[in-house]
Amino acid sequence: MLDRFRTAQAGSIARLRRLAEEGQLPAPWNFSEINARPGFAAALRTAGAPAVIAEYKRASPSRGVINLDLTPADVARMYAENGAACFSVLTEAAHFQGDLRFLTQMAFAGRPMLRKDFLLDPLQVVETAATPASALLLIMRMFADAQAVREMLDACRLYGLEAVCEVFDEADLDLARAAGAEIIQVNNRDLDTLATDLGVSRRLAARKEEGELWISASGLD
């Protein structure tokens, strides 16, 4: 499954490289001095445990279209009214019918937003910075080595974004730490097999280190 997601990124990355060559990459989102890009990790820490990251996903490969009756704005309003600390927004188009514009449509709710996609190239960090997102997802299994992850983390710091490094097992966790990850998200659903096991979070949590912010994702009702 991850190979399919990786292949689907080729067109987006090629488009961004053409824009870079032409000097036409999008400018960073223009926040006002008063209303700066909200802190993702800070919001989770302030909310305390358990802090909820509420996800907006229009469709999925396994379920197809989930809901077309509610707009991204409708969902953002309901999530905010019910106490979500942050939003996670699927922007991948080919398999999840996502769109970067969802981030703009949900920003009014004032919650820090995580761009959830299958990002591989630092130019996609630049693209994310042109939206009101506060953070982006980096899936460790998408990267060949720690240096590739480190390049993405460096780009995030340069553009004022936070990186959520997603892991499925001990090897992924070792890779994230070797690259300098500060926010670790344990996905209980293995994207290679789509099997869900809440025991993954319980097992890996034993390796949490001081100063790290950890998130458990998938399979939680």
Which residue stretches match the model-derived regions?
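Catalytic alpha/beta core domains of metabolic enzymes, predominantly
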Residues: 198-201, 205, 212-221
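Conserved N-terminal beta1-alpha1 strand-loop-helix module at the mouth
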Residues: 1-113, 120-123, 155, 160-183, ...
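Glycine-rich phosphate-binding active-site loops on the catalytic face of alpha/beta enzymes
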Residues: 85, 89, 130-145, 185-194
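Structured beta->alpha junctions
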Residues: 91, 117, 218-220
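Generic beta-sheet signal
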Residues: 116, 139, 166, 186-187, ...
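Hydrophobic, well-structured mid-protein blocks that either form specific transmembrane helices
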Residues: 106-157
